[in-house]
A protein has these predicted regions:
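Extracytoplasmic/secretory soluble proteins
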Residues: 2-4, 11, 15-518
Length: 518
C-alpha cells in the first residue's frame, strides 16, 4: 500500500467563493459596481444578447423550457431586460465520447461545459478556440479582484503562444479538493452488525473480512463489491492516478512523473481486483453490465461497498439518488487533497467566437453570484419542482419534471439550498475539509510547450495511447486485465517511447521547481 506523504496546506478556493458572494451581493440591483470597471453594469442593462450555453442532457428535462423562461424573467426583474440565456446540447449528445471534443472547437455557443481532462482534448481545441484567462478578466474588470485567487487552480495545456493556451472559467465549487472514500450500504451493515467496524477501516484490505461475511450471507444474489466503480481503488494507492489511463502521472511519493502502466501501485490494484473476483466478492456478471443497468436492479441489500471520490455531506446526495432503496455510509480512506482535475473538471470554456464575450462573461458571473439564479437553474421553480421545508432544505416534488443535476458544475454551491440529510453546518465542514487538504508539490506545474518536446514523436505516442485506451479502458476500470493484456499494453507503450515522455516531464518539472525555490 502506498501512502500519501505530502504536507498539509490551506487552499484559497473557499475564500474566493465567499468573496465572490459577498462582493456581488453588495452590488445587487445597483447600477454601479466596485471599482474602475463599474460601467459594465450600465452597459449590460442596455445590452440585448442571448447567451447560449452548451450543457449536455439538460434539454431532456421535461420542464427545461419553463425553467429557462423563469430564469430570463428574473434577469429582467434584476434590471437586465435584454439579457437572456439558452441552455441546450442539441449537437453534443454523446458528450462523454472523446470525438465530441471536436465540437468544442467550433459552433455558435458562447459558453461550453468543458471537462477537458487530458492533452487529447487540448489538442482538439488548440488554435485559439478559447479566450485566454486574462482576456476574460479584461472583459469584466470587476472580476479581476474577485477571481484572482482562482489563478493558481487553472490547469492549462496548449502550445507555447498565449493565444493557443486553453484557459477556462473556474466554477465556484464548494470544495477545492476531494478524498477517496468507501461507500457502503447501511441497510446491510446494520443487518450484519458491522456499522462501526466499517466506519473505522483505514485501508481497502481491511474490508476483506466483511466482504467475505457479505458473500456468505447473500451468496450470488448480492454484490460484495460494486465492480463498475472499482477502478477508483487506484486512487487509494496513488491519488489522482485513475484520471490518466496509461499516460504519465505524477507520483507524490517520489515527487516525479511515471507511466501509469509501469507503476507499482497499478500492479497492486490489478492484483487486488483479481483476488476479489477470484474470491467471489465481485460477481463476474458485472463485467458485462454498465452502471446504469446495474443500478436499476439495486434493492435494499444488493451490494455492500463501492469506491469513489467524495466530499463533506456527500451521503445526502447519494441517498437522494438511491430514491429510498438504501442508505449509504462512508469510510474515508485518504486525506482530502487538492487535485487539478477535480478543480477544473467542471469548468466552462468561453468561446473566442462569441459575438458578445463580455455579455457571456458577465452573465456567467451573475449566475455564479446570485442566489435566486443559482437555485433556479439547479432546482427549478420553487412550489413547482421543489419546496423548502421549515429548515430551508429543498425537497423535490415527486415526480419532478426538472432535475438538472447541475449542482456540481453550474452556479455557486455556497448559495444553493441544502439537500435532505445535509448538515446545517455544511459550509463549516467544507472549510475544515479545504483547510486540511493536501497540496501536492507539483501544484501549478503545467505541461511543457512545444519547444520542450523537440526530438520526441508525441504524435506517434498519442496514437498508441488512444488505441490502447479504446481497447483496454473498460478492462482497466473494472480490474479485469489479463497478464497478456498487461504485457501488450507495456510492449506497445515501450515501442512508443513512453520513457521519453516521462523524461521530458521530469526534466521540465525539475526546472520548474528550481525556478520556484525562492
Amino acid at each position: 500500500m502506498i501512502f500519501l506523504k505530502a504536507p498539509r496546506v490551506k487552499t484559497a478556493a473557499l475564500f474566493a467563493a465567499i468573496l465572490l458572494v459577498v462582493l456581488f451581493s453588495s452590488c445587487k440591483g445597483k447600477a454601479g459596481g466596485f471599482g474602475a470597471g463599474r460601467d459594465v453594469y450600465e452597459r449590460m442593462r442596455n445590452t440585448t444578447y442571448e447567451v447560449k450555453f452548451n450543457f449536455p442532457g439538460l434539454e431532456r428535462q421535461p420542464d427545461h423550457d419553463m425553467v429557462i423562461r423563469a430564469f430570463n424573467d428574473k434577469l429582467t426583474e434584476m434590471g437586465y431586460p435584454g439579457l437572456s440565456i439558452r441552455l441546450d446540447s442539441s449537437d453534443w449528445a454523446s458528450w462523454m465520447d472523446r470525438s465530441s471534443a471536436l465540437v468544442l472547437s467550433g459552433g455558435d455557443y458562447d459558453l461550453v461545459y468543458a471537462p477537458i481532462m487530458t492533452p487529447f482534448y487540448a489538442d482538439a481545441m488548440a488554435g485559439g478556440a478559447w479566450l485566454p484567462w486574462d482576456s476574460y478578466i479584461d472583459l469584466v474588470p470587476e472580476f479581476a479582484e474577485l477571481l484572482a485567487p482562482w489563478r493558481e487552480y487553472l490547469y492549462v495545456w496548449g502550445a507555447d503562444t498565449k493565444e493557443k493556451h486553453i484557459y477556462r472559467i473556474p466554477n465556484i465549487k464548494e470544495y477545492a479538493s476531494y478524498r477517496c472514500e468507501a461507500r457502503w450500504n447501511k441497510n446491510v451493515a446494520e443487518r450484519l452488525g458491522i456499522t462501526e467496524q466499517l466506519r473505522n477501516i483505514k485501508n481497502v484490505y481491511e474490508f476483506e473480512p466483511y466482504l467475505e461475511m457479505y458473500k456468505n450471507v447473500y451468496g450470488n444474489n448480492g454484490m460484495a463489491v460494486l465492480a463498475v466503480d472499482s477502478y477508483k481503488l487506484v486512487d487509494c494507492f496513488m491519488l489522482g492516478a485513475f484520471n490518466s489511463f496509461l499516460d504519465s502521472v505524477y507520483d507524490v511519493n517520489t515527487d516525479s512523473y511515471l507511466n501509469y502502466a509501469f507503476s507499482p501501485w497499478f500492479d497492486e490494484y490489478i492484483a487486488l481486483t483479481r483476488s476479489w473476483y477470484a474470491k467471489g466478492y465481485i460477481p463476474a456478471y458485472q463485467q458485462t453490465e454498465l452502471i446504469d443497468d446495474l443500478s436499476m436492479k439495486f434493492g435494499p441489500e444488493s451490494f455492500l461497498v463501492y469506491f469513489n471520490e467524495g466530499k463533506p455531506g456527500g451521503e445526502a446526495e447519494m441517498n437522494q439518488n438511491a430514491k429510498g432503496r438504501y442508505e449509504m455510509g462512508t469510510t474515508y480512506l485518504t486525506p482530502a487533497f487538492v487535485d487539478f482535475n477535480s478543480l477544473m473538471g467542471v469548468a466552462w470554456g468561453l468561446n473566442a467566437r462569441s459575438k458578445n464575450p463580455e455579455a457571456a462573461a458577465f452573465l456567467f458571473g451573475l449566475l455564479s453570484s446570485n442566489k435566486e439564479l443559482t437555485n433556479l437553474i439547479n432546482f427549478g421553480i420553487e412550489g413547482v419542482h421543489y419546496n423548502l421545508d421549515s429548515n430551508g432544505v429543498a425537497v423535490r416534488t415527486v415526480p419532478s419534471q426538472y432535475y438538472s443535476n447541475l449542482l456540481w458544475m453550474l452556479g455557486n454551491r455556497f448559495l444553493c439550498h441544502r439537500l435532505p440529510g445535509e448538515p446545517e453546518n455544511l459550509s463549516e465542514l467544507y472549510q475544515e475539509f479545504n483547510n486540511n487538504a493536501v497540496k501536492f508539490p507539483n501544484f501549478g506545474f503545467q505541461e511543457p510547450g512545444e519547444e520542450a518536446w523537440k526530438g520526441v514523436d508525441r504524435d506517434m505516442y498519442k496514437g498508441v495511447l488512444g488505441a490502447l485506451r479504446t481497447q483496454y479502458q473498460r478492462s482497466i476500470e473494472i480490474g479485469t486485465l489479463s497478464d497478456a493484456d498487461l504485457a501488450d499494453i507495456r510492449r506497445r507503450l515501450t515501442q512508443a517511447n513512453y520513457q521519453q515522455i516521462d523524461a521530458v516531464l521530469n526534466r521540465e518539472y525539475a526546472a520548474y521547481k528550481g525556478s520556484n525555490e525562492n
